[in-house]
A protein has these predicted regions:
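Conserved catalytic core of the tyrosine transesterase superfamily
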Residues: 1-296
Length: 296
């Protein structure tokens, strides 16, 4: 991608107030697209885009989420920056993402996992991800001024979609934050990184999460986002209504929040199986006392 085209695309994203993370991602994706053909995107057309999507799918074996990012970047370039009059749903189709369910940690597993995070700063960040349902990018960019102990809320500024919101400040989380403050005495950012004036990186927290997961011995996968998922499901199972959870998590659509209804087990477990309603028990061919212990 030429310097002029990169500059034009960046300016188009800036005037639309896209986040810096989105801008960086889109420029990277379009640059990879151009390098694949060793040509400027200005001379590439519909068939080239189709071939690139097939390359990402069949040769690179990328998942639908990764391809979706590439497609969004290419769509922006050709629709906005280059102004191509195409039917983009037809020309640059976005892959359908499989409706998979995240694996949810139980409350006991959350306690155990957080206890395995040895660094106080990283443990505090991951605790906030669970206690307030924050994205990792939101947690690492918190400033001390975001903690409002008078109103017992945390102000999340410019979250995903450039939207501000408030989340609850748990009394227990407040005590964790106070203890962290006295232990670390951070300057500027609440969670400063190695570069003066800059917050800790997402990568550093993700590495700490991986190390804690290895120490914990948990079979379930754990990422910072796993704690956000657990926040939503545990609230839902405790009786919090879906609209409140949507506001706390900063979801634009209630449909995004509604997927947690498929994960919450409180209603599932409270539903009686028809097997238990049969008039007589079904025969069990093996004496359960004589077989080896089962894995469940």
């Amino acid at each position: 991608m030429t310097t002029n085209l990169r500059q034009r695309m960046t300016e188009d994203m800036q005037v639309r107030n896209l986040s810096l993370l989105t801008q960086s991602s889109y420029v990277q994706q379009v640059s990879m697209f151009a390098r694949h053909f060793n040509k400027s995107p200005e001379v590439l057309g519909i068939e080239d885009i189709r071939n690139y999507q097939l390359y990402l799918t069949n040769q690179k074996k990328l998942n639908a989420s990764s391809i979706k990012v590439a497609v969004s970047a290419i769509r922006f370039l050709y629709r906005v920056t280059l102004g191509r009059p195409w039917d983009f749903d037809e020309v640059v189709p976005s892959p359908k993402k499989p409706r998979t369910l995240p694996i949810i940690l139980s409350p006991e597993e959350v306690v155990h996992f957080l206890g395995c995070v040895t660094n106080v700063k990283q443990r505090t960040i991951l605790t906030i991800c669970y206690a307030a349902g924050l994205r990792i990018s939101e947690a690492v960019h918190l400033m001390p001024s975001a903690i409002d102990r008078q109103r017992m809320v945390i102000r999340i500024e410019q979250g995903k979609g450039r939207k501000d919101r408030y989340v609850m400040l748990s009394p227990k989380l407040l005590q964790v934050l106070i203890a962290y403050w006295h232990a670390v005495r951070p300057k500027g950012c609440l969670f400063p990184g190695d570069i003066p004036g800059q917050p800790i990186t997402r990568g550093a927290v993700e590495l700490a999460c991986q190390a804690a997961h290895a120490r914990s011995g948990l079979c379930k996968p754990v990422t910072p986002h796993s704690l956000r998922h657990a926040f939503a499901v545990h609230l839902l199972e405790a009786g919090t209504d879906l609209r409140t959870i949507q506001l706390l998590m900063g979801h634009s659509s209630l449909d995004t929040t509604a997927r947690y209804l498929r994960i919450a087990t409180s209603k599932v477990c409270a539903t009686t199986s028809p097997l238990d309603l049969l008039p007589r028990p079904i025969p069990i061919p093996i004496d359960a006392k004589q077989i080896e212990p089962s894995p469940f």
